[in-house]
Amino acid sequence: MKKIFLSVGEISGDNYASELAKHLKEYQITGITGPKMRAIGVKPVANLEDISVVGLTEALSKYKKIKEVFKQSVQALKSGVDLLIVVDFPGFNIKLLKEAKKLGIKTVYFISPQVWAWGSGRVKEIVENTDLLISILPFEEEIYKPYVSDKFKFAYVGHPLLDIIKIYENEDSFKQKLNIPKNKRIIGLLAGSRESEVNVILPILIEAARLLTKTFDDLHFVIPATVNMVDRVLEKVNFSLPITVITSNLSDKNLPKFENPSYEVMKNAVFSIITSGTATLEAAIIGNPFIIVYKVSPITYFIGKKLVKINYLGLPNIIAGNEIVPELLQDRCNPLDIANKTLEFLTDKNLYKTQKRNLEIVRKSLGKKGAIERASNLIRTLLEKGQA
């Protein structure tokens, strides 16, 4: 049985990689895993929770652990692996690709890093150390196509979220499971899946919720907490407010549980406040209006502003080419501004409807369903025939 090492460093990567692993069951798969990968039987060499970071300051605090996980991963590659698949997370994964290349192991980059945001500096490194790059965003083709050769192949497969997003509740059943009165409107508060995001952004969102309750008496706030962040979320929530925390079926906490809690919130909330990341594209696909918030340490923001080559942070805005979803970043990521922007959407029907129309355009631009199946077929061909 051929062996695959699968490396992810973020919860969103775990989401994609677990679906990919389901389509490659004929192979033995190990790697750096998240909760969904572990739940379907991918054997962990290490856990993504140990290496998932945002920004320079958090990376420094976890440097020793990241170095240890990298060493463990290289040892696993040396023990006999036929294929390395890495998912986004370039700071770690590009180095791992280089080690695999030295060992003569075939390599796949599934979901390119955001080279279009950070400039082309990493493109050459990726091309030199990747046999097959599988892209999920349509505009990446023009970046990589000039580099295609016998040694580097590129394929655009469409976006996996079109297959992954499944919603099981309607508004009535969702409210019933959460004991929310029918006459209440749900507002989603999505603070991210990383410790630094929950620590910094969640308290801001909760204070924004408190401000909104002064204007509206019919709002109920729902926070979907990832398995790895449930305890941290519960520590920060002010339960004197109309707030409910929900989590995943994978959690052992005594909370309302759903297969994909974030999706249920995005679908059944009239409006959501969402931390920048993959969740913003998930929300765009689901189609209910939202705003994007983000805040990092001043030094991380300063460095990012110098390096980033794009005008927007949120993926829906990058794809659309303009700010169809308001972005409240850094100093604007504060309770008053967030509450005021939310109030605008709750009181202006035209604003609300316009964003819904724009989100539908973004969704249609992401291609057709079947991305994971197309990706797994490409990987299977590379493994069995030695070429993509």
UniProtKB/Swiss-Prot annotation:
GO biological process: lipid A biosynthetic process
EC number, UniProt record: 2.4.1.182
Pathway it works in: Bacterial outer membrane biogenesis; LPS lipid A biosynthesis
Native source species: Sulfurihydrogenibium sp. (strain YO3AOP1)
GO cellular component: membrane
Protein name: Lipid-A-disaccharide synthase
Catalytic activity, reaction form: a lipid X + a UDP-2-N,3-O-bis[(3R)-3-hydroxyacyl]-alpha-D-glucosamine = a lipid A disaccharide + UDP + H(+)
Catalytic class of the enzyme: transferase
Keyword Hydrolase: no
PANTHER family: LIPID-A-DISACCHARIDE SYNTHASE, LIPID-A-DISACCHARIDE SYNTHASE, MITOCHONDRIAL-RELATED
Keywords: Glycosyltransferase, Lipid A biosynthesis, Lipid biosynthesis, Lipid metabolism, Transferase
GO molecular function, one term: phospholipid binding
Annotated function: Condensation of UDP-2,3-diacylglucosamine and 2,3-diacylglucosamine-1-phosphate to form lipid A disaccharide, a precursor of lipid A, a phosphorylated glycolipid that anchors the lipopolysaccharide to the outer membrane of the cell.
InterPro entries recorded: Glyco_trans_19
Pfam families recorded: LpxB (PF02684)
UniProt superkingdom: Bacteria
Family classification: Belongs to the LpxB family.
